[in-house]
C-alpha cells in the first residue's frame, strides 16, 4: 500500500446521508475474478447517464473537483452490504481519505485495511469543511495523519485515529506486511518460548 503521511489534494463534497455500498459499487461490478477496473464502477449510477456518457452534474465529473483524493461525506457513509469491492474501487479511483461524522462499521474496517483513511469529525466541523470544499477556490485541503489534523483555508481540525491503524497507514502496510515487519521479534519470542517450554514443541 502507499504510505500516508501528509497529503494535499482536492476534496469533493458528497453530503447525502446513508450512502450505501450499492451506490458506491453497484452489484454488476462484483462479477470479476480480480480487482482490476473497479474504479469504473465507483458511483456508476451517479457518474454516468443511462447512455453511458458522463453525468456533468455529478461532482467528480466537474472540472473543479476532478481528481479529488478526499471525499467529504454525509453520515453513515458505507452502510448496507459488506462488499469490500466498494473500498477497492474508491482506492483505484484515487481516493485516499473520507471525512465524515460516521461510517458503517464493516466499511470503516475495510477502508483502514486497504489504505483508505476514515476521519470522523463533529457535525459542526463537517459543515465547515463541506462549505469550504464546495468553493472551487478553496477546495484543496491537507490531511496530516502524523499530526492528526485536517488543514483547510478556514483553519485546522483535529481528529482521532486508532494508533495501530495510524502506524500501518503511515508505513503503507497491510495486515500481512505489518506482521512481517515484526518477523525478527516473532522468531525471537518463538525461540525463547520453546526453549523454556520444550515439551510444547511438536
From Swiss-Prot:
EC number(s) on file: 4.2.1.33
Disulfide bonds: none
One of the protein's GO biological processes: L-leucine biosynthetic process
InterPro entries given in the database record: 3-IsopropMal_deHydase_ssu, Aconitase/3IPM_dehydase_swvl, AconitaseA/IPMdHydase_ssu_swvl, IPMI_Swivel, LeuD
Superkingdom per UniProt: Bacteria
The keyword Disulfide bond appears for this protein: no
Catalytic activity field: (2R,3S)-3-isopropylmalate = (2S)-2-isopropylmalate
Key words of the record: Amino-acid biosynthesis, Branched-chain amino acid biosynthesis, Leucine biosynthesis, Lyase
Assembly: Heterodimer of LeuC and LeuD.
Protein name per Swiss-Prot or TrEMBL: 3-isopropylmalate dehydratase small subunit 1
Amino acid at each position: 500500500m502507499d504510505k500516508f503521511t501528509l497529503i494535499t489534494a482536492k476534496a469533493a463534497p458528497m453530503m447525502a446521508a446513508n450512502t450505501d455500498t450499492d451506490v458506491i459499487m453497484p452489484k454488476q461490478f462484483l462479477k470479476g475474478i480480480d480487482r482490476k477496473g473497479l474504479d469504473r464502477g465507483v458511483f456508476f449510477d451517479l457518474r454516468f447517464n443511462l447512455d453511458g456518457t458522463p453525468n456533468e452534474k455529478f461532482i467528480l465529473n466537474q472540472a473543479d473537483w476532478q481528481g479529488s483524493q478526499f471525499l467529504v461525506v454525509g453520515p453513515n457513509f458505507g452502510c448496507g452490504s459488506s462488499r469490500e469491492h466498494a473500498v477497492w474501487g474508491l482506492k483505484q479511483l484515487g481516493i485516499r481519505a473520507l471525512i465524515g461524522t460516521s461510517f458503517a462499521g464493516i466499511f470503516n474496517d475495510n477502508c483502514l485495511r486497504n489504505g483508505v483513511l476514515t476521519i470522523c469529525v463533529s457535525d459542526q466541523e463537517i459543515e465547515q469543511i463541506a462549505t469550504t470544499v464546495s468553493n472551487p477556490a478553496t477546495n484543496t485541503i491537507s490531511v496530516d495523519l502524523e499530526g492528526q489534523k485536517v488543514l483547510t483555508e478556514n483553519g485546522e481540525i483535529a481528529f482521532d485515529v486508532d494508533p495501530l491503524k495510524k502506524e500501518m497507514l503511515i508505513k503503507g502496510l497491510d495486515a500481512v506486511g505489518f506482521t512481517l515487519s515484526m518477523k525478527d521479534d516473532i522468531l525471537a519470542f518463538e525461540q525463547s518460548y520453546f526453549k523454556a517450554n520444550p515439551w510444547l514443541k511438536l
